[in-house]
Amino acid sequence: MAIVGLFYGSDTGNTENIAKQIQKQLGSDLIDIRDIAKSSKEDIEAYDFLLFGIPTWYYGEAQADWDDFFPTLEEIDFTDKLVGIFGCGDQEDYADYFCDAIGTVRDIIEPHGAIVVGNWPTEGYNFEASKALLEDGTFIGLCIDEDRQPELTAERVEKWCKQIYDEMCLAELA
């Protein structure tokens, strides 16, 4: 078993593709990828280092498989677990809800002890509002817009992976 569990939900394949890019960047020896639709509470509890991939749909809605899993997520003790969150959204058509689902996940796991890592700058994005925003003006995790900025995805994923690698101290564990 790898030391980082990456759990994602995806309807169109965009978030799944990002998950695979992250695994490629960080290494399959470090990252296990799992579809949240086929995952259990015990699957998540098995890891101290987690990455959650969740797209935002329409007016701030979570992807359906994640939405179904939220009650289970609320039962998990995340004390001392490091969690990075990434997701896809559309900053133009849904500018008032850009990557809201990332913020929704944070709102569920932080009260249960999660240490969320991987804050991401908002520079280069054009949106109105997001539940993923922190008080310091950064996103709580990596926001990807495959609809409007697909040409920036590879670079953003690469930079975020380097950041996650450092913040989770994965070099010391590999």
UniProtKB/Swiss-Prot annotation:
The keyword Transmembrane helix does not apply. The keyword Transport applies. It comes from the Bacteria. GO terms for molecular function: electron transfer activity; FMN binding. Residues 4-165 form the Flavodoxin-like domain. Its cofactor is FMN. Keywords: Electron transport, Flavoprotein, FMN, Transport. InterPro entries: Flavodoxin, Flavodoxin/NO_synth, Flavodoxin_CS, Flavodoxin_lc, Flavoprotein-like_sf. Pfam families: Flavodoxin_1. Belongs to the flavodoxin family. Low-potential electron donor to a number of redox enzymes. This is Flavodoxin. It comes from Haemophilus influenzae (strain ATCC 51907 / DSM 11121 / KW20 / Rd). The lineage of its organism: Bacteria, Pseudomonadati, Pseudomonadota, Gammaproteobacteria, Pasteurellales.
